[in-house]
């Protein structure tokens, strides 16, 4: 790819991507456009702009994508109740397609012929980014420095930075933090370092977002979440934008010690990896959404969704957000959400999210039918006999054959 003229780099301003920026200029002799995404990671992003300016970069993009992230990526995923391997709420996985999408858009806007990312050759993110690139712009050139260069240790990166006068001050990870961290509006992840020993408990100081459950308030807090079309639209009667609503749930969940997990997951590239995650708002939202569905979804539609959910979650985890099979599943899921409307009441207490009430104008729950009291003929219990005998037929035939 020696003919690369201009490349759009996903740029954080940290050590890795700053070295990549200089390396791209040196190796390819190309112009670099930097792109820094605000996905709600809580960092001041202007330092990334200033650092890019110090490199002499002429085209610098620092984009606030929080609303698009929540509205067009997080919320559609939560309509599916997507959970990977029973625990992971896909906070990193769902962010990569949006970054890839915006990189491709910037490449088109600036006339760039290539994109670049800072994901390593061992992880899932390289796959997620590049499947996104190719799914949106099949002819794009992709540069993945970690698969090309020999700067395969932090010491070599630091030496390269020193030789080229790259400022590496002020970043926590550059000071030798014991974890690799990634944050956005949905979660914070922690990997590597001491966590590579699967028997070692993560230190309390690692968790940057949530209170420990035992340190959470001793009094529970009740909240109401309103839904329309399968998406949350209000908390305690206050309508909020998608990003603001998720941010509010994060604050509530963090205060009450909600959303910590410590898991070993199966990466798409084949290895197992330990990760610790904080997903306070997402944990609340998942519980609330399932409660809302419990009274508004038809039984078999709900069961079909649950059967398909692991496949949907796997597609998101592996990076197939823009693939036709994910889009087909999304269309089916979205059709089921038309009547997912109403309010769920939750009790938040020391790491727990407890559903205590749900109501909907589209509810399929009919107390006059479900009651244990006199139902005034709404349900004839004698009808159950024929239903049971028909469903028992194959079991009776099997028992007869066995003698």
From Swiss-Prot:
Its main location: cytoplasm. PROSITE patterns: ARGININOSUCCIN_SYN_1, ARGININOSUCCIN_SYN_2. Keywords: Amino-acid biosynthesis, Arginine biosynthesis, ATP-binding, Cytoplasm, Ligase, Nucleotide-binding. Its EC number is 6.3.4.5. Belongs to the argininosuccinate synthase family. Type 1 subfamily. It comes from the Bacteria. This is Argininosuccinate synthase. It is an enzyme of class 6 (ligase). Pathway: Amino-acid biosynthesis; L-arginine biosynthesis; L-arginine from L-ornithine and carbamoyl phosphate: step 2/3. It holds the Pfam family Arginosuc_syn_C. L-citrulline binds at residues 88, 93, 124, 128, 180, 189, 265, 277. L-aspartate binds at residues 120, 124-125. It comes from Halorhodospira halophila (strain DSM 244 / SL1).
């Amino acid at each position: 790819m020696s003919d690369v003229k201009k490349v759009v780099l996903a740029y954080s301003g940290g050590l890795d991507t700053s070295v990549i920026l200089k390396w791209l200029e040196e190796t390819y002799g190309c112009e670099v456009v930097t792109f820094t995404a605000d996905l709600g990671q809580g960092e001041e992003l202007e330092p990334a702009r200033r650092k890019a300016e110090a490199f002499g970069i002429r085209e610098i993009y620092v984009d606030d994508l929080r609303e698009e992230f929540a509205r067009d990526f997080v919320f559609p995923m939560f309509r599916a109740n997507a959970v990977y391997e029973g625990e992971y709420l896909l906070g990193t996985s769902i962010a990569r397609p949006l970054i890839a999408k915006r990189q491709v858009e910037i490449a088109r806007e600036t006339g760039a012929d290539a994109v670049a990312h800072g994901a390593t050759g061992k992880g899932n993110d390289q796959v997620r980014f590049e499947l996104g690139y190719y799914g949106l712009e099949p002819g794009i050139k992709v540069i993945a420095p970690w698969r090309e260069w020999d700067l395969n240790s932090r010491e070599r990166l630091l030496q390269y930075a020193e030789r080229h006068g790259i400022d590496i001050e002020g970043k926590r990870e550059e000071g030798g933090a014991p974890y690799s961290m990634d944050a956005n509006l949905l979660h914070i992840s922690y990997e590597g370092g001491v966590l590579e020993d699967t028997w070692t408990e993560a230190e309390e100081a690692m968790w940057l977002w949530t209170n420990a459950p035992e340190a959470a308030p001793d009094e529970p807090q009740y909240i109401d979440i309103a839904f329309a079309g399968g998406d949350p639209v209000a908390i305690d009667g206050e309508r909020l934008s998608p990003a603001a609503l998720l941010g509010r749930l994060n604050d509530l969940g963090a205060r009450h010690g909600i959303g910590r997990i410590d898991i070993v997951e199966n990466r798409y590239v084949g290895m197992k990896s330990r990760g610790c995650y904080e997903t306070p708002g997402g944990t609340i939202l998942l519980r609330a959404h399932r409660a809302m569905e419990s009274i508004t979804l038809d039984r078999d539609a709900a069961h079909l969704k649950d059967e398909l959910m692991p496949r949907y979650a796997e597609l998101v985890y592996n990076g197939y957000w823009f693939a036709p099979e994910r889009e087909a599943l999304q269309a089916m899921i979205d059709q089921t959400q038309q009547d997912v409307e109403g309010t769920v009441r939750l009790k938040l207490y020391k790491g727990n999210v407890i559903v205590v009430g749900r109501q909907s104008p589209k509810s399929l729950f009919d107390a006059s039918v479900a009651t244990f009291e006199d139902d005034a003929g709404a349900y004839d219990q004698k009808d159950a006999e024929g239903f049971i005998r028909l469903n028992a037929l194959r079991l009776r035939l099997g028992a007869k054959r066995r003698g």
